[in-house]
């Protein structure tokens, strides 16, 4: 069995790479994943990360080295072991990163990594369901929605932050990330929008081969 490309790891990045490569006509791609398929309902139910984090079927269950800043404790370091990788077990929070950090990368000599360079790709990747803004994208594969949770204790926390001098923001991924507000989620119609859901599943729909097992201990998807 031969492929034009073999991608090791069907995590957040691997699913994107498989999607992009398999979009090219006549190209065959093998995507290898050490974990299993993302069939568990706990993966797709947003609150299900309480079940998937720390579970050996979906999490590598890493532990950090003891650290002086933690009083020499070792803590859990969840990493996804399933299609979609950590995007299938994380808390669904969507945060792009500070523009100043990207600009500093450029200042250090990394051409193509300034905020102005990467913003078009952030916009291309997302389907933002909130208010329109120049910094936000629509029509992309990764669905990003506003948090519609209404909890008095969170509202009180936000109000306390405002009283402490923080500015309330309705879109921390917009023009200015500094402030306090509800977080945004990678979710669509009440279901988690993981990298596998956003990039891999559509890829399998428009290519002819079906996912298949290449061994009893590995579950790759080929496109």
Task: Label every PLM stretch briefly.
Residues 15, 214-217:
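Alpha-helical transmembrane segments and their helix-entry boundary regions
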Residues 71-192:
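Rossmann-like flavin
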Residues 206-213:
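Conserved small/polar residues in nucleotide/adenosyl-binding loops
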Residues 1-123:
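N-terminal glycine-rich phosphate/pyrophosphate-binding loop and immediately adjacent elements
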Residues 195-196:
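Amphipathic coiled-coil/heptad-repeat helices and related helical stalk/stem segments
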Residues 217-223:
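Hydrophobic alpha-helical segments, chiefly the membrane-spanning helices
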């Amino acid at each position: 069995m031969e492929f034009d490309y073999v991608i090791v790891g069907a995590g957040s990045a691997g699913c994107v790479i498989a999607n992009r490569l398999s979009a090219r006509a006549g190209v065959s791609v093998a995507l290898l994943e050490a974990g299993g398929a993302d069939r568990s309902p706990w993966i797709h139910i947003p609150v299900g990360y309480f079940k998937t984090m720390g579970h050996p079927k979906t999490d590598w269950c890493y532990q950090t080295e003891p650290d002086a800043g933690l009083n020499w404790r070792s803590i859990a370091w969840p990493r996804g072991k399933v299609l979609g990788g950590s995007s299938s077990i994380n808390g669904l929070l969507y945060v792009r990163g500070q523009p100043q950090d990207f600009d500093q990368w450029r200042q250090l000599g990394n051409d193509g990594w300034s905020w102005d360079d990467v913003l078009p790709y952030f916009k291309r990747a997302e389907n933002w369901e909130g208010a329109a803004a120049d910094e936000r994208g629509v029509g992309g594969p990764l669905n990003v929605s506003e948090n519609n949770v209404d909890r008095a204790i969170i509202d009180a926390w936000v109000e306390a932050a405002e009283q402490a001098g923080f500015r309330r923001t309705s879109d921390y991924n917009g023009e200015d990330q500094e402030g306090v507000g509800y977080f945004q989620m990678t979710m669509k119609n009440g279901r988690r929008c993981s990298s596998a859901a956003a990039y891999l599943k559509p890829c399998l729909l428009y290519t002819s081969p079906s996912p298949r097992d290449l061994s009893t201990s590995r579950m790759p998807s080929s496109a």
